[in-house]
Amino acid sequence: MKILIFIIASFMLIGVECKEGYPTNSEGCKITCLFNDPYCKGKCINLSTQADKKWKGVEGYCNRRDIACYCKNLPENAEVWDPNNNKCVG
């Protein structure tokens, strides 16, 4: 019985971590928003254009501190804004 509890507890501790970050526009800048969670959710989850199919995050919201869309649970190959490799010109 103790072994069964140990195995169940071990599975609960093992978490699956997904990629998170700020999606970028064509210029490499964060996608800006202002109190518009549905817009950001659409950018992260329900995008209709073929070019945006890489954004299949489960969650998306407007990060009001940075005034930019933020995505959670993105696939590992999704490109997100990187402060060390900032391509934004504006």
Curated annotation (Swiss-Prot):
Residues 19-89 form the LCN-type CS-alpha/beta domain. The keyword Nucleotide-binding does not apply. InterPro entries: LCN-type_CS_alpha_beta_dom (IPR044062), Scorpion_toxin-like_sf (IPR036574), Scorpion_toxinL/defensin (IPR002061). GO terms for cellular component: extracellular region. Beta toxins bind voltage-independently at site-4 of sodium channels (Nav) and shift the voltage of activation toward more negative potentials thereby affecting sodium channel activation and promoting spontaneous and repetitive firing. Belongs to the long (4 C-C) scorpion toxin superfamily. Sodium channel inhibitor family. Beta subfamily. Has the structural arrangement of an alpha-helix connected to antiparallel beta-sheets by disulfide bonds (CS-alpha/beta). This is Putative beta-neurotoxin RjAa14F. It comes from Rhopalurus junceus (Caribbean blue scorpion).
